Curated annotation (Swiss-Prot):
GO molecular function (one): DNA binding
Compartments in which it is found: Nucleus; Chromosome
Family, per entry: Belongs to the protamine P2 family.
Residue ranges, compositional bias (Basic and acidic residues): 8-17, 39-48
Primary role: Protamines substitute for histones in the chromatin of sperm during the haploid phase of spermatogenesis. They compact sperm DNA into a highly condensed, stable and inactive complex.
Organism in which the protein naturally occurs: Gorilla gorilla gorilla (Western lowland gorilla)
Chain intervals for the UniProt region annotation (Disordered): 1-102
Record protein name field: Protamine-2
Assembly description: Interacts with TDRP.
Principal localisation: nucleus
């Protein structure tokens, strides 16, 4: 599938910023005070909407969850296997001990 090149949000925001500067020079101070135009809102959503999403990856809560999952995942698997296969309970207990060392 071929896609045409779309400008990145950063390129677009610079272009809008330039337009605002030129508008102020010509004497259009009222438009900026009233609020964002539809075009500016679109740019604002693109540039600022994803910034929160990107920050989320580095949050301590998320890192802690990932860290916990690494340690608990093997224990969870063993517990589930025990529930389904009741015959092998003794083998599962010995496996759990080796699992906790990690």
């Amino acid at each position: 599938m071929v896609r045409c090149r779309v400008r990145s949000p950063s390129e677009r925001s610079h272009e809008v910023y330039r337009q605002q500067l030129h508008g102020q020079e010509q004497g259009h101070h009222g438009q900026e005070e009233q609020g964002l135009s539809p075009e500016h809102v679109e740019v604002y959503e693109r540039t600022h909407g994803h910034s929160h999403y990107r920050r989320r990856h580095c949050s301590r809560r998320r890192l802690r969850r990932i860290h916990r999952q690494q340690h608990r995942s093997c224990r969870r698997r063993k517990r589930r296997s025990c529930r389904h296969r009741r015959r092998h309970r003794k083998g599962c207990r010995t496996r759990r001990r080796t699992c906790r060392r990690h």
